[in-house]
């Protein structure tokens, strides 16, 4: 089953294992029409999905395109996403809870857009 959005990573980030990360770039799911593999776009983070994946913290930034013409939902913050698009939020959550098989990934919880921005800054590679 395909992802419920455009799945990728945030450039210039690395979740350092010594700091509790998974050793990869920060994951992102952009809720938008299908993008080409390798496309880079500006986004607005609207929330963070925190998961336990086989005992390891797995952080997913949820975002929408910054360009209003590319947005398929009119949510640019966590409050609007959870109230106006609660079913979309549940689809994203359920997909990530089941994509590796039943019971492998467990929900820690959702966090807001401010938390998403903090995570992006936390894992940004110093230039």
Model-based region annotation:
Residues 1-127:
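Hydrophobic N-terminal alpha-helices or hydrophobic patches in metabolic proteins across all domains
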